[in-house]
Swiss-Prot record:
Lineage, top ranks: Eukaryota, Metazoa, Chordata, Craniata, Vertebrata
Extent of the Sequence repeats: 129-135, 136-142, 143-149, 150-156
Pfam families associated with the record: HIN, PYRIN
Start-end of Polar residues biased regions: 207-218
Protein name: Interferon-activable protein 211
The Pyrin domain, residue ranges: 1-88
Stretches with biased composition (Basic and acidic residues): 86-99, 159-176
Role summary: Inhibits cell growth via p53/TP53 and RB1-dependent and independent pathways. May work in synergy with TP53 to promote the transcription of CDKN1A/P21.
Sequence segments annotated as region (4 X 7 AA tandem repeats of T-S-T-A-Q-A-[GR]): 129-177
Tissues in which the protein is found: Mononuclear phagocytes.
Domain HIN-200 as annotated: residue spans: 213-413
TM helices/strands, residue ranges: none
UniProt cross-references to SUPFAM superfamilies, sorted A to Z: HIN-2000 domain-like
Protein induction: By lipopolysaccharides (LPS).
C-alpha cells in the first residue's frame, strides 16, 4: 500500500503540477525534508518523492500534498483527484467505483436492457412500436377513404415537417459549447479580427478542421489565423488547472494582449509559453484560433519573440480600455451567454453546499457571481477585489448572474493591497 501511495504522489501529484507550484511545495516542506535552501530548485520530483516516502512512511506524504493542493485555488481539482486515488487504495470507495464502472460508461444501454428483460428483446419492442405507429397511420388514412390521395400528400408533408423539426432541433442544440465561447459584447471584449462574411468564415473553419489535428479546446466555429500577428503583452495570470472535454485535468492561463488598434483576451493552453507572456513583452503569434473575439493559443500555435523591427507602439487609450472593467449595470443588460472579464469589489459572500454566492458591487449596481468547483469558497472576504476571467452571464427567473465555466479563473486582491505579484509576471 505504501508503494501505491508513492505512485500517487509521484505520478498523479508532483509530475502534474507546474514548476512554480512545485517550487512552492518544496519551500513549504524544506524543514520537514531537510532541504538545503540554496539548492531547493535542484531537487527533482523523484528525489522529493523518495524523501517524502522516508519522512512520512504511513502514506508517503500524500496527505501533505493534498493539504497543499487544497490551499491553492488553482490546484483544488488536483486535490480532489488525489483524494479519490487515496480512497481507492484504502478501499473506502470500492462499491462506488464498481457502480461507476457499471453505470456512467453505458447508462442508456443498461436501462434499455432492463426494459428489454421486462418486455422482451429491445428489437422486438422497437418492432411493436413501429407496428403501433403504422397502425395509427393506417387508421388515420382509413377515416377518409375518398380522400386517400390528399391523406397521402398530407402524410408526406407531415414527414417533411417532422424532418425539418428534427433539423431545427439539432440546430438549436449546436451552440451548446463551453460557456467561455459564447458571444461577447463590445463593452468587455475586443472586436473580431476579420470582418469576413459568415459563409467565408465557415468555409475557412471547415478547411482548418481538416488540415489541423483534432483539439478539443477549439470551439465550434473558431477561425484559424495562420498569418503572424505582433502584439504587446499587457497582463497574464498564473497557470491553473481545468477539466478538458475528455475529463482530463490540464493547465492553462489567461492573458491580455494589444496591437496598435485593439486589445484581445487570450486563452493559452500551452503553459510552456508562460515566460513569453510577460508584461510589455513583444511577441509574434501565428496558427492561433479566434472565437468571438477571444484568441486561443494551443500546442500547434507558434509564439516567438518579436524582432526589433517588429516592435509596435500601443496607444495609451488601448491599454486603458483593456484594463477597464465593465459597469455592473451594463452587465445586467447583457445577453445570456455573454462572457465578461473585470475587477470588482466583493460586497457579500455566502457559502452553500454545492457552490458559493459572491455578490459584487460598484457605483452602478450589484450582481451575484456563482462559483463552483475550484471556485467554491475561495479565500476572500468583504472588501477584497475579485478579478474575474471568462465568466458568462446567465438568467434565472429573470435575474442576471455571472456563472463560472470550464475556463473561468478568479484572482483575489486583498483589501489594502494594490496588486498581487502573481497577477502579472
Amino acid at each position: 500500500m505504501v508503494n501505491e501511495y508513492k505512485r500517487i504522489v509521484l505520478l498523479r501529484g508532483l509530475e502534474c503540477i507546474n514548476k512554480h507550484y512545485f517550487s512552492l511545495f518544496k519551500s513549504l516542506l524544506a524543514r520537514d525534508l531537510n532541504l538545503e535552501r540554496d539548492n531547493q530548485e535542484q531537487y527533482t520530483t523523484i528525489q522529493i518523492a523518495n524523501m517524502m516516502e522516508e519522512k512520512f512512511p504511513a502514506d508517503s506524504g500524500l496527505g501533505k500534498l493534498i493539504e497543499f493542493c487544497e490551499e491553492v485555488p488553482a490546484l483544488r481539482k488536483r486535490a480532489e483527484i488525489l483524494k479519490k486515488e487515496r480512497s481507492e487504495v484504502t478501499g473506502e470507495t470500492s462499491l462506488e467505483k464498481n457502480g461507476q464502472e457499471a453505470g456512467p460508461a453505458t447508462p442508456t444501454s443498461t436501462t434499455s436492457h432492463m426494459l428489454a428483460s421486462e418486455r422482451g428483446e429491445t428489437s422486438a419492442t422497437q418492432e411493436e412500436t413501429s407496428t403501433a405507429q403504422a397502425g395509427t397511420s393506417t387508421a388515420q388514412a382509413g377515416t377518409s377513404t375518398a380522400q386517400a390521395g390528399t391523406s397521402t400528400a398530407q402524410k408526406r408533408k407531415s414527414m417533411r415537417e417532422e424532418e425539418t423539426g428534427v433539423k431545427k432541433s439539432k440546430a438549436a442544440k449546436e451552440p451548446d459549447q463551453p460557456p467561455c465561447c459564447e458571444e461577447p459584447t463590445a463593452m468587455c471584449q475586443s472586436p473580431i479580427l476579420h470582418s469576413s462574411s459568415s459563409a467565408s468564415s465557415n468555409i475557412l473553419s471547415a478547411k482548418n478542421q481538416k488540415s489541423q489535428p483534432q483539439n478539443q479546446n477549439i470551439p465550434r466555429g473558431a477561425v484559424l489565423h495562420s498569418e503572424p500577428l505582433t502584439v504587446m503583452v499587457l497582463t497574464a495570470t498564473d497557470p491553473f488547472e481545468y477539466e478538458s472535454p475528455e475529463h482530463e485535468v490540464k493547465n492553462m492561463f489567461h492573458a491580455t494582449v494589444a496591437t496598435v488598434s485593439q486589445y484581445f483576451h487570450v486563452k493559452v493552453f500551452n503553459i510552456d509559453l508562460k515566460e513569453k507572456f510577460t508584461k510589455n513583452n513583444f511577441i509574434t503569434i501565428s496558427n492561433y484560433f479566434e472565437s468571438k473575439g477571444i484568441l486561443e493559443i494551443n500546442e500547434t500555435s507558434s509564439v516567438l519573440e518579436a524582432a526589433p523591427k517588429q516592435m509596435i507602439e500601443v496607444p495609451n487609450c488601448i491599454t486603458r480600455n483593456a484594463n477597464a472593467s465593465p459597469k455592473i449595470c451594463d452587465i445586467q443588460k447583457g445577453t445570456s451567454g455573454t462572457v465578461f472579464y473585470g475587477v470588482f469589489t466583493l460586497h457579500k459572500k455566502k457559502v452553500k453546499t454545492q457552490n458559493t454566492s459572491y455578490e459584487i458591487k460598484d457605483g452602478s449596481g450589484s450582481i451575484e457571481v456563482v462559483g463552483s468547483g475550484q471556485w467554491h469558497n475561495i479565500n476572500c472576504k468583504e472588501g477584497d477585489k475579485l478579478h474575474l476571467f471568462c465568466f458568462h452571464l446567465k438568467r434565472e427567473r429573470g435575474q442576471p448572474k455571472l456563472v463560472c465555466g470550464d475556463h473561468s479563473f478568479v484572482k483575489v486582491t486583498k483589501a489594502g493591497k494594490k496588486k498581487e505579484a502573481s497577477t502579472v509576471q
